[in-house]
Amino acid sequence: MIEVEVKVRADHSKIRPVLMEMGASKIGVEEQSDVYFAAPYRDFAKTDEALRIRSLGGHSVLTYKGPKLDKVSKTRVEIETPVDGTATAKIFHSLGFLEAGAVRKKRDIFRAGEIIVCLDAVEGLGEFLEVELDVEDKKDLESSRAELFKFLSQFGLSEKDSIRTSYLEMVLEKRN
Ligand code: ATP
Ligand code: CA
Ligand code: CA
């Protein structure tokens, strides 16, 4: 699966009324607690990959993300599977993987047609908006990305507002 994703900084109180007006439906609220891992043999910050255990509502999901595929969005291969978070972390630690950092956020999730809209309140960082389309085929990347930017234009947002820095990088930058 390829996630086609655009992230922007956004005041949620300005976004919510527009979402309501366009008839977007709320599909969930998640308290996400993410731990990112660093491999002993490869610097994921340099290779632009990610290895993460996400804990939410009593269960955990393991995620691999590949390098970003374009210059304007956060489009990339994403592989996810449910796991036992505690056991998986123990396995990683045993193999010499270190924790690179943690990100905690509250995510309000909406659906507007095919587009998944996330209102993220990230601990220590503030409010963000992420919009996402998942595609199977690389040939659909460009049209999906265009669709996301067209969607964002309804909020007065454009390509120049797109942030490609990850929450983890922002958390780490703030810490240093
Ligand atoms: P998702 O969209 O899957 O819910 P998210 O929105 O919580 O994730 P993002 O900021 O979109 O978080 O993506 C996580 C990011 O963390 C990835 O872009 C990845 O490249 C980055 N990352 C992972 N490991 C490292 C590392 N060691 N150093 C710097 N960045 C990393
Ligand atoms: Ca995503
Ligand atoms: Ca994201």
Residue ranges and their predicted role:
Residues D134-K139:
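A generic structural motif
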